[in-house]
Curated annotation (Swiss-Prot):
This is Sperm-egg fusion protein Juno. Changing N73Q: Reduces apparent molecular weight of the protein, in agreement with the loss of one glycosylation site. Abolishes secretion of the extracellular domain. Changing W184A: Does not affect ability to promote sperm-egg interaction. A lipid is attached at G222 (GPI-anchor amidated glycine). Pfam families: Folate_rec. GO terms for biological process: cell adhesion; fusion of sperm to egg plasma membrane involved in single fertilization; sperm-egg recognition. Belongs to the folate receptor family. Changing N185D: Reduced stability of the protein. It comes from Mus musculus (Mouse).
């Protein structure tokens, strides 16, 4: 019996770490992402912050910078040119989505209960990230608030539906929170937390600095696993108590 209790104590110490590791430094299962993160030399421009540990390839980082990204068969110019600052924020958001290895706590299957392709859901972007993105795009034009669904595919590429005219971003996204959360169908969540709080992710950071999102992913990975461990380990403990 003493040996079993020693094993249990070891599980209490080790299981949270082992389980948490599954949510840290991982890539989602998709056609564009690598199977696992690792160094990538010469990522293109806005994707450079992830060169030390990336889920994207150099080719993907280059495609993220095209006016009509091959990644999504979609033109950011569907209502004319975005302002340079607005376009830069979108490229940074694409790089973050494609390259970051710190999105594990928010990875979910595209199809409920499915085991194949995955997406991220509700990634908490820092307040400044949403505000800066919104200000940069305030005067640019778009015809939709959700860029993932509801497009006209009659010409094999996404075009504005006939009944949805081009209007300023401020019409479709009255607040920074609206932009962050609606634009990619809840891929991102507008966090009330600010940068360096350890409770929100930055969609971009200076390539010369360490990745601030590692600490944040660690925090949320622990939070996500706490409910599971709170049932599993006590249940095992009870079994030992009644073990003859």
């Amino acid at each position: 019996m003493a040996q079993w209790w020693q094993i249990l104590l070891g599980l209490w110490a080790v299981l949270p770490t082992l389980a948490g590791d599954k949510l840290l430094s991982v890539c989602m299962n998709s056609k564009r992402h690598k199977q696992e993160p690792g160094p990538e030399d010469e990522l293109y421009q806005e994707c450079r912050p992830w060169e030390d540990n990336a889920c994207c390839t150099r080719s993907t980082s280059w495609e993220a910078h095209l006016e009509e990204p091959l990644l999504f068969n979609f033109s950011m110019m569907h209502c004319g040119l975005l302002t340079p600052a607005c376009r830069k924020h979108f490229i940074q958001a694409i790089c973050f989505h494609e390259c970051s290895p710190n999105l594990g706590p928010w990875i979910q299957p595209v199809v409920p209960n499915g085991q194949e392709e995955q997406r991220v859901w509700g990634v908490p972007l820092c307040q400044e990230d949403c505000e800066d993105w919104w200000r940069a795009c305030h005067s640019s034009l778009t015809c939709k608030s959700n860029w993932l669904h509801g497009w006209d595919w009659s010409e094999e590429k996404k075009h504005c539906p006939a009944h949805e005219p081009c209007l300023p971003f401020s019409y479709h996204f009255p607040t920074p929170d609206d932009l962050c959360e609606k634009i990619w169908n809840n891929t991102f969540k507008a966090s009330p937390e600010r940068r360096n709080s350890g409770r929100c992710l930055q969609k971009w950071f200076e390539p010369t600095l360490s990745n601030p999102n590692v600490e944040v992913a660690l925090h949320f990975a622990g939070s996500a696993l706490a409910p599971q461990l709170s049932y599993t380990l006590p249940a095992f403990s009870l079994c030992l108590l009644f073990h003859p």
